[in-house]
């Protein structure tokens, strides 16, 4: 869990990193940061209430983000300083928070994926996985779709500087 990546303070329009962090630090933020928990609960309430536009605005204005692919001098693919060896798999449009939590747990334990970090997305209806690989790790999306019968697996972005 010592892979390095860039982190950015909100809003999402920031292109210059605030600093670098490890995967372990990202895990701690997700599991222990009370202010992030408060924002996440508010985001999930917006989703439950069908207030999608407000959800997007709050998410873009309030949540910090990282570039799991590595350390960047700015948020652009040609600004990669060092690769982390990680890519992101996004699974979206799940039916409920409970389904997302169950899928997160299954995928984290899957021996073939080698998942380093799995968490329920801020809206509560998706899962994000940080797995070993590079931009060519399309096999992971196919594997998850076949094994877990998912229809909504978003491929890892072509641009490694894409935020998560």
Show the residue positions of the predicted features:
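Ala/Thr-enriched low-complexity intrinsically disordered regions
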Residues: 161-162
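Conserved small/polar residues in nucleotide/adenosyl-binding loops
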Residues: 152-157
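Signature for HUH/AEP ssDNA processing cores
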Residues: 1-125, 132-148
